[in-house]
Amino acid sequence: SVSRGLGDVYKRQAILRAMGRRTNQAQIRDVVSRLRKAMPDITIRTTLITGFPGETKEQHDALMQFVDEMEFERLGVFTYSPEEGTRAADMPDQIDEDVKKQWQEEIMALQQEVSYDNNQKMIGKVLQVLIEGYLYQDDVYMGRSYREAPNVDGYIFVSAEEEIVSGEMVTVRITDANEYDLIGEVVYEFTE
């Protein structure tokens, strides 16, 4: 219901205010919506903190709902950890480490589903891929497009009929996908 949804938003906004954040979920929704409308192929990446002092199960559930709704292409989730000398370290209602870890795992499990769905939508698309290496055991190259950040995102695994040199850009049609990686083949003659 709308009233329940708005209540969840307000609950989550209380945590954002406690963190000193100057944005709210409505602003984030608006910006993401405008970006996706202007650039349909955009990849939106964000990070979240869970287990901030005073965060409730209801606020965690509201965050889960937000993650599900926003369908971020890339998402990292960190658990809050107190840092000496900060206001938050001295706040009451510190969250138990086990709860923080559970909440992090719940968000990442949801994001894994979102990521899988997003990657499935990439099947059939053609991307420019920077080749970074070759996996001999699998007989495939690995690389990244503009969508994958080094050291944090998955790869695009590429089959090719001809040898490719690391550092080379190739045109790849995506043929399959899993939660975090794309699989494709070099397109030698591309016509759209």
Where are these regions (language model features)?
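Residue-level recognition of specific faces of alpha-helices
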Residues: V2, I15-A18, L63, R74, ...
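Short, contiguous acidic/charged loop-to-helix segments that flank catalytic cores in large enzymes
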Residues: A18-A26, G51-K57, Q94-D98, V158-E161
